[in-house]
């Protein structure tokens, strides 16, 4: 890699060789980015290499229906037009822990189940978070009536949890989004993000990577269909400036949560929902959606479901922006279906879907 200084002079050094020599368990993420382990004793030696521009700790990523659809008026939207809106013809990508693909609510609509971290498994053995999230988007309710928002959409799943440890590992965001796009997904929903308080509100390299992909797919000159990307705002409220990365990205739909069941008005943020603004003054989250006590699919292999507030054989209840985000993703799926089938716009940009989702929401008249 040739790196030029202010005077135009360059130093020739291959960053991959530095990574190969300095790092254990080295992994090439994206162009100019490597991940791995090295001793703190080697820190100065690494940063002195001419091709190394910056270092940082690996960010820790965490996980951030019937009543939900009523709150979002989805049932009214589905039947308002001559053509019913149910997600038909749409592929939604869900990046999350894992998937119980054999849960009856997905039928034969799983078009891909991708293992993204190298542990050889796409199962959902711990909390069942990924199965719950995916079913909220597009489950058909065949096991007991808790159907998702877009029950005829197809699913491309990307598993990101290590079965052995339960740790959540984010692969390259460029690779994650590109893989889903190449599989036909045009909605990409993510109920996870950084749990580091030190980077809350910051526009990090992860946020930049997401914006890069969104911008690339939305460029009309590329002749490509747009990609709508959603991220959970996080569960670190009620203080301001608590939205984590990559939810701080400019082009994504950042989703907070309101109550979906029991007490609480839909126009009130739940206390734990992360608040904006971002460090550079942008409003986040962009929208709020039902995220309190959401009932959705229960992964049959899940072994750690003690945090759920209600359970049956096939369904359980979770709360958080993780639950709100797939509800919003389902709504985005119906919007995209509307644009293609009814408005006759065959390749809607992600920015257009985001704009209609935000402008179609009800103003709650408060940032709190």
What residue ranges belong to the model's regions?
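N-terminal domain-start motif of subtilase-like serine proteases
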Residues: 1, 37-43, 61-94, 117-128, ...
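Short, surface-exposed ligand-recognition loops at beta-strand->loop->(often short) alpha-helix junctions
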Residues: 1-10
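Autoinhibitory propeptides
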Residues: 9-81
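Subtilisin-like serine protease catalytic core
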Residues: 10, 16, 79-114, 118-169, ...
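Sec-exported extracytoplasmic/periplasmic mature domains
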Residues: 16, 20, 47-51, 138-142, ...
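Active-site glycine-centered loops adjacent to acidic/histidine catalytic or metal-binding residues
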Residues: 96, 210, 234, 320
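Extracellular S/T/G-rich loop segment that most often corresponds to the catalytic His/Ser-adjacent loop
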Residues: 104, 244-333
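Active-site neighborhood of phospho(di)ester-bond hydrolases with catalytic His/Asp-centered motifs
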Residues: 189-191, 229-234
């Amino acid at each position: 890699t040739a790196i030029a200084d202010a005077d135009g002079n360059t130093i020739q050094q291959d960053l991959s060789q530095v990574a190969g020599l300095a790092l254990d368990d080295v992994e090439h993420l994206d162009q100019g980015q490597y991940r791995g382990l090295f001793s703190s004793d080697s820190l100065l030696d690494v940063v002195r290499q001419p091709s190394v521009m910056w270092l940082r700790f690996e960010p820790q990523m965490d996980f951030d229906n019937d009543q939900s659809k009523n709150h979002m008026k989805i049932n009214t939207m589905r039947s308002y037009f001559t053509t019913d809106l149910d997600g038909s013809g749409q592929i939604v990508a869900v990046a999350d822990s894992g998937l119980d693909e054999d849960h009856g609510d997905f039928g034969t609509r799983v078009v891909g189940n991708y293992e993204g971290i190298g542990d050889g498994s796409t199962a959902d053995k711990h909390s069942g978070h990924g199965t719950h999230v995916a079913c909220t988007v597009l489950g058909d309710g065949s096991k007991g009536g808790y159907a998702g928002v877009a029950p005829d959409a197809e699913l491309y799943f990307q598993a990101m949890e290590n079965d052995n440890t339960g740790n959540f590992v984010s692969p390259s965001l460029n690779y994650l989004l590109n893989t889903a796009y190449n599989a036909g997904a045009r909605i990409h929903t993510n109920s996870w993000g950084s749990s580091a308080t030190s980077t809350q509100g910051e526009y990090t390299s992860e946020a930049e990577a997401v914006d890069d992909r969104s911008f690339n797919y939305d460029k009309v000159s590329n002749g490509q269909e747009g990609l709508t990307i959603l991220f959970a705002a996080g569960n670190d409220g009620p203080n301001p400036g608590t939205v984590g990365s990559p939810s701080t990205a400019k082009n994504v739909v950042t989703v907070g949560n309101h109550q979906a069941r029991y007490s609480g008005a839909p126009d009130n943020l739940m206390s734990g929902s992360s608040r904006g603004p971002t460090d550079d003054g942008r409003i986040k989250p962009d929208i709020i959606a039902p995220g309190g006590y959401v009932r959705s699919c229960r992964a049959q292999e899940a072994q750690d479901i003690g945090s759920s507030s209600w359970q049956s054989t096939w369904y359980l209840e979770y709360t958080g922006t993780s639950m709100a985000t797939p509800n919003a993703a389902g709504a985005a799926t119906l919007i995209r279906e509307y644009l293609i089938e009814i408005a006759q716009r065959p390749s809607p940009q992600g920015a257009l879907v985001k704009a209609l989702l935000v402008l179609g929401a009800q103003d709650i008249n408060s940032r709190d």
